Amino acid sequence: MYKEDTIAAISTPHGAGGVGIIRISGDKAFEIAERIFRGKKDFKLIRSHTINYGKIVNPENGAVLDEVLLSKMEKPKTFTREDVVEINCHGGMVVLKNILELCIKEGARLAEPGEFTKRAFLNGRIDLSQAEAVIDLINSKTNESSKAAISQLEGKLSRKIKDARSKLIELLAHIEVTVDYPEHDIEEITGNMVYEEIGKIKEKLCDIVKSFERGRIIREGIDAVIIGKPNVGKSSLLNELSGKSKAIVTDIPGTTRDIIEEYININGIPLRIIDTAGIRETEDVVEKIGVEKTHRAIDEADLVIMMIDAKRGMDEDDNRILTMLGDKKLIILINKIDLVDEKQINEIESLLKGRKCIRTSVKEGTGISELENAITELFVQGEVSVNEEILLTNIRHKNLIDMAISSIEKAMESIDGSMPLDLVSIDITDAADYLGQITGESVSEDVMHEIFSKFCLGK
C-alpha cells in the first residue's frame, strides 16, 4: 500500500565526507523545514527550486545543528511529484544523523529502501522499468553500463514495450466489438488480420530479446577467474589488469592462499576478475582450503583464464587442470615468454592441441592488450558500445518478453487451427499483461516490493 505520509532519509553514502544530503518528501516536507530552518527569508517566501543558505536549528532549545544549503522544490515538478526539501549539510555522520532525527521528531518517517523512487513510480513520474534503471545507474561500473541505464531511464525501452502493448489492447478491443456487437457498423476483424498484426508485434519483441546477451554483459559484466599452478604469474596478471598492487607477488610458490578479486573495465565490459590459489597437490591445510575455494570459483565463473609457465613447460598438473575445466569458456596464456626461446613455446602450443593461446610476459606487459581483445571477442560480437539502439539488460524484462512472445505464438497457433477469436483473445490478453508487468501497468505488490527492496536508503 502507498503510505501518504512524509518520509526522510540520508541520501549520501555513509561515512565522513565534505557534504551530506538529507532528503524529505511528502505533504509535511515544507512544514517540517519551516520549523527547523533559519535563513535570511521566511521559509514561506522562498521560491521553489532555489538553494538557500541558513542553519538547522532545534526549535525546542534553539541549538544550532549545522550551517546548510537548503533546496525547496514544490510539487509536481520534483522526482517524487511531492513537495521535496533537500538539506545539504557537512558530511559527518553525527551531523547527518542529528538532522535526520530532528526531521523525524518533527513529523517525518524514516524512508524505506528505494521509497523515494517507489513514490516517483506510484505518482506517475516514471514507470517500473525506469525505476529499475535508477539502481542500474547507481551500480554501473563502466561508461557503457552507465549509458545503458540512462537509455532505459529516459524511457527508450518503455516506449517500445508500451507501443507493443497498446497495439495488442487495440486488437483485443476490435475483437470484442466483432464478437459481442456484430450488429454495429464497424469493419469486422478476421483471424488473418489478427494473425498478421500479432506477427508484426512478435517480430519487434524478438528483435528486443536478441539484444539481451549483449545488454546483460554490459550491465552485469563477466566473472573471470585466473587459474594455474603456483607461481605462474596469476597475481602479477591481476595487478597488471587492475593497475593496482592488490595481490602479493613473490617467487615463493603458494603465496596466494585465498581468493582475491578486483573489478576492472575491459573495453567497456565490467569484469570481476578473481586471482586464486595455485592448483596443485599439497599437504598444507591453509593452502588446501584456498585450492577448494579455487574450484568453487571456477564452477561459478563465466570465463577461465589459465596460465602456463613457459619456462617450466606443460606437466601433469596443467593437464589435470585442463581436464577439470571441461567446456568452460577458456583463454590460455603462455606466460614468461621473455625467459624462453621460440622452440619451447612451440612445444607447449603443440601439447595444447590447437587450443587458442596468447603469448604473454606479464612482467613486461606483453600480450595484455591481446588478452583484453580476446575477452571482448569471446562475449560480445563487434564493438562494445551503447548508441541509439535498445539494449535489453534486465533478466526480469527478458523473461516477461519471452512469455509475451510465447502467448502470441499460442494465439497464432489457435488461429491456424481455426479457433474462434474470443478464445484467441485469451492468449493475446496474457501477452499484454506480461508486457504491462515490465512497465508496471499490471504488476503485483510483491513484485514491487522485491524490486524496490534492492535500493539503498535515500534513493
Curated annotation (Swiss-Prot):
Care to name a GO molecular-function term for this sequence?
GTPase activity
List ligand-binding residues for (6S)-5-formyl-5,6,7,8-tetrahydrofolate.
23, 86, 125, 459
Task: Tell me its EC number(s), please.
Answer: 3.6.-.-
One BP annotation, GO? tRNA methylation
GO cellular component terms, semicolon-separated: cytosol
Its keywords, alphabetically, are:
Cytoplasm, GTP-binding, Hydrolase, Magnesium, Metal-binding, Nucleotide-binding, Potassium, tRNA processing
Residue ranges of the TrmE-type G domain? 221-380
Q: Where in the cell is it found?
A: Cytoplasm
- How many cofactor units bind, and how? Binds 1 potassium ion per subunit.
Cofactor section = K(+)
Protein name according to UniProt? tRNA modification GTPase MnmE
Protein source organism: Acetivibrio thermocellus (strain ATCC 27405 / DSM 1237 / JCM 9322 / NBRC 103400 / NCIMB 10682 / NRRL B-4536 / VPI 7372)
